[in-house]
A protein has these predicted regions:
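Histidine/cysteine-enriched polar flanking segments
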Residues: 1-152, 157-260, 267-352
Length: 352
């Protein structure tokens, strides 16, 4: 069977701007098997998993399970598990860590404060090597296991601080992963590329190759960030920030296609509700034939204006449009063919 990752690669689908969105990550060690919905389908008490999901909802915190690479026998004994909190916004990224014996204690965290970037001194600061989290949950998509688990194992053998993670979206970009402290995700990754990404993160930099975007931002903003970085060849992780993002009327016909830059995909903070979710391949009904009326097929494409600032004082207005005009591909293994939504960068204009 042709996999979703193979189909996406063959279609040269852009990976930029498809990262999972999370201003703050809560990563909870859980050995043993993971189900499709890992927080409630693993050896974690499902009542705790559901409560964590509810506590994080709408706060900017994303909860995921992690485990060390390798075989995952789980004898169900009550043992201390490693937990991480990581805030990925460029103003002041941080990682906190602890070992907890009862995961229900995590429900005492102030999720709203954590999502806003305030850890209030909880747990201990993490000051070790950059952390790599590789998506490996084969119950969600076989590509994550077939491609992700060997990569995670190879990274662990090489000495990287590698973990497996339940779900970060974008199965068809497997092997896919993100690196902390900066929260940039990568797709179609190889071991040499990840090792370079870790070395770059150690120096406060990112890689532009195979980069899906920074999880702190929604998809239009991810696209805008990467477009500016490509334009000025900026790799310092915290040199770029997103100042503002808003939905705007689409450009006039003709201008939109003439102005497309790199095809970087993304979406931005305040307009998250209007943007496709984190590389899951939300399909645009205007172009997939799923529209219920002819009028919808002619609906204007969602468009955003994103203001991007450099710490040296420069800034740009980046116009980003949602499109679904690529080669039909499955968004995950076994799903029907469709045209996954992408973010097209139409223009990058300097301000001031």
């Amino acid at each position: 069977m042709r996999t979703c990752a193979t189909a996406s690669r063959d279609a040269t689908e852009p990976v930029a701007g498809t990262s999972a969105t999370a201003r703050t990550w809560l990563l909870v060690e859980q050995t043993g098997p993971w189900g499709t919905e890992a927080l409630t389908e693993s050896h974690l008490d499902p009542r705790v998993g559901r409560a964590l999901e509810a506590a994080a909802d709408g706060t900017g915190v994303r909860v995921a399970l992690v485990r060390r690479p390798g075989r995952h026998a789980d004898c169900h004994r009550s043992a201390a598990r490693r937990v991480f909190l990581a805030h990925t916004a460029p103003s002041r990224p941080w990682i906190r860590t602890a070992a907890v014996t009862g995961p229900e204690a995590l429900l005492d965290l102030d999720f709203a404060r954590l999502g806003a970037g305030e850890h209030d001194g909880v747990w201990d600061p993490y000051d070790g090597e950059p952390l790599v989290f590789v998506c490996t949950n084969g119950k969600r998509d076989r590509c994550c296991a077939v491609l992700g688990r060997p990569l995670a194992a190879e990274l662990a053998v090489s000495g990287a601080e590698a973990w497996e993670v339940t779900h970060i979206g974008g199965h068809r970009f497997s092997p896919t992963l993100f690196v902390l402290p900066y929260g940039y995700a990568y797709g179609r990754a190889s071991a040499p590329l990840v090792k370079d990404a870790v070395a770059s993160a150690r120096e406060g930099r990112i890689l532009l190759d195979h980069c899906r975007g920074r999880s702190a931002w929604e998809r239009p903003a991810q696209a805008a960030d990467l477009a500016v970085r490509e334009l000025i060849r900026e790799e310092r992780a915290d040199a770029i920030d997103i100042v503002h993002s808003e939905a705007v009327p689409p450009p006039h016909d003709g201008a939109e296609h003439a102005g497309e830059k790199t095809g970087n995909p993304s979406r931005a903070g305040k307009d998250a509700k209007d943007s496709p979710r984190e590389g899951e391949g939300t399909q645009d009904p205007r172009r997939t034939g799923t529209a219920s009326t002819t009028g919808l097929l002619d609906a204007p494409a969602p468009t955003w204006a994103v203001t991007v600032a450099h710490r040296d004082g420069r800034s740009w207005r980046v116009t980003v449009e949602q499109r679904a005009d690529g080669t039909p591909t499955p968004v995950s293994c076994g799903s029907p063919l469709g045209r996954p939504a992408r973010m097209a960068v139409l223009s990058v204009l300097p301000l001031g």
